[in-house]
Amino acid sequence: MEKKYFAPSELIINEDGSIFHLHLKPENLADKVILVGDPGRVALVASHFENKECEVANREFCAIIGTFKGKRITVLSTGIGCDNIDIVLNELDALANIDFKTRTENEQLRQLTLVRIGTCGGLQPYTPVGTYIASAKSIGFDGLLNFYAGRNQASDLEFEAEFKKQVEWDSQLGNPYVACADKELLDTIAADDMVRGVTIACGGFFGPQGRELRLPLQDPKLNEKIENFSYNGMQVTNFEMESSALAGLATLMGHKSVTVCMVIANRLAKEANASYKNTIDGLIEKVLERI
């Protein structure tokens, strides 16, 4: 069987041999990858490394490759949103599993371990500001996974149907999907000191998360319905903006992934911590030790 050829219009490679957006080369990619949204957080993670091989930056995508306690790690910023995760996951997978010289799939496929460290808004009384939440399931309001074949195989369809039923989901909002973290990686990273939750990845920070400034909301009671949702003992614990695309695409590509977030605002208690950057290092240290 002839190998599939990836044309220059589909797989864009820069003149220096790096991939189009991330500006990383295949040799820059470790099997263990830590993803952060904020480019400034890359240096914070890498400050724990014993040594650094190289640093790369393009737009919001900043990367440092180094070693922590003998583990080679690539830490990379994604920017905000599932659209950026689509770029990051596809380009990381290409770096891992496509021969850039022949533009064909490698004979031996690599499985990456991907851990996203982020921030989120808590939705339950037991997720106050400062809580660490590991996303066992992620409900994607973004619709990204719906563009890929295998979407249903990578989704928890029963959970999805029950969610849409309980919150009286309006089809005009698009079709949500429910993607799961890798169970083994979830157990390793969450251990016994993180809340294992159900996360909603929203397509925006304001309206999609129920924040109302000058523009009114299409469904002002949606957040209340989300907070009251319960299925098989699981509730929606938090809002963020990337976890569903990460979990869904990683599953389809054969990689392991999990998202862990620190709660910086609790929507029920109307509390927020704007100076969270001083305290997220504790979560970073846990992930570095456990990845």
Please report, for each region that a protein language model flagged, where it lies by residue:
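Active-site rim beta-loop-alpha module in soluble metabolic enzymes
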Residues: 158-231
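Intrinsically disordered, low-complexity segments enriched in small residues
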Residues: 21-28, 203-206, 281-290
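A short, acidic, amphipathic alpha-helical segment used as a generic capping/interface helix at domain edges
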Residues: 223-233, 239, 243-249
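Zn-dependent metallopeptidase/amidohydrolase metal-coordination segment
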Residues: 244-275
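Structural signal for hydrophobic packing residues in well-ordered secondary-structure cores
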Residues: 49-53, 93-96, 100, 189-193, ...
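His/Asp/Glu-rich mid-to-C-terminal helical/loop segments that flank catalytic regions of hydrolases
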Residues: 266-291
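Metabolite-binding pocket within alpha/beta catalytic cores that recognizes anionic/polar moieties
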Residues: 2-177
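Glycine-rich beta-alpha junction loops
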Residues: 121, 138, 200-207, 245, ...
